From Swiss-Prot:
Domain of life from the UniProt record: Bacteria
Name of this protein: Large ribosomal subunit protein uL1
Organism of derivation: Petrotoga mobilis (strain DSM 10674 / SJ95)
SUPFAM superfamilies: Ribosomal protein L1
Physiological role: Binds directly to 23S rRNA. The L1 stalk is quite mobile in the ribosome, and is involved in E site tRNA release. Protein L1 is also a translational repressor protein, it controls the translation of the L11 operon by binding to its mRNA.
Length: 236
């Protein structure tokens, strides 16, 4: 277990680990317990009622945050011809085909946050799986990153669309903004993320889908959320 410093221990005193806080209290606390000198990220951690060892119960998809992530998202697009031109026009940071494939394959280059590809390019980038896969950057139809409408995809990811997937413990992690965001903006992102997440319940997942939810700022303590304060039908 990592050792926590003096500042962490000080802010930890503000949080009752046995209490589930309503959404407004939780957001107030996440701001109070942020102690980094930089503008930390507020992240939502959700324990799902799934068996992650079963492929048909794994959750992967995208969540669109109405107030964005507060992050400058670097988007790479694998495309050629007219699609490449559309991607550049939409604001993609890197656009190319064989040149980008070789750079990633030979140098292990991954200085981007999202990779989008047109379907016809996928056969070429399959060999990049060993580099992109472990970093969660491999284009996927489920994540909306394999598409012919590259311009729309670029705009959506730049505006606050994020890919989500459960980890090996059945938890899912979603950045919902920066500590500097207004509380109302964080709240809107949080509720929207929950609404979208509840719609991703796998058919073979029985019982309660949302088991537990915690929010925390970068390096800050976790704050338990009272799920009943969210009024979501899929929580029960």
């Amino acid at each position: 277990m990592p050792k926590h410093g003096k500042k962490y221990k000080e802010v930890l005193k503000l949080v009752d680990k046995q209490k589930n806080y309503d959404i407004d209290e939780a957001l107030d606390l996440v701001k109070k317990t942020s102690y980094t000198k930089f503008d930390g990220t507020v992240e939502l951690h959700v324990l799902l009622g799934i068996d992650p060892k079963k492929g048909d119960q794994n959750v992967r998809g995208t969540v669109s945050l109405p107030k964005g992530t507060g992050k400058n998202v670097r988007v790479l697009v694998f495309a050629e011809g007219e699609k490449a031109a559309q991607a550049k026009q939409a604001g993609a940071d890197f656009v190319g085909s064989d040149d980008l494939i070789e750079k990633i394959n030979n140098e292990g280059w991954t200085d981007f946050d999202v990779a989008i590809a047109t379907p016809d390019i996928m056969r070429k980038i399959g060999r990049l799986g060993k580099v992109l896969g472990p970093r969660g950057l491999m284009p996927s139809p489920k994540a909306g990153t394999v598409t012919d409408d590259v311009a729309q995809a670029v705009k959506e990811f730049k505006a606050g669309k994020v890919e989500v997937r459960n980890d090996r413990t059945g938890n899912i992690h979603i950045p919902i903004g920066k500590v500097s965001f207004d509380k109302d903006d964080l709240k809107e992102n949080l509720i929207s993320a929950f609404d979208q997440l509840t719609k991703m319940k796998p058919e073979n997942s029985k019982g309660k889908f949302i088991r537990k939810a915690v929010i925390a700022s970068t390096m800050g303590p976790g704050i338990n959320i009272d799920l009943s304060s969210l009024s979501l039908s899929s929580v029960a």
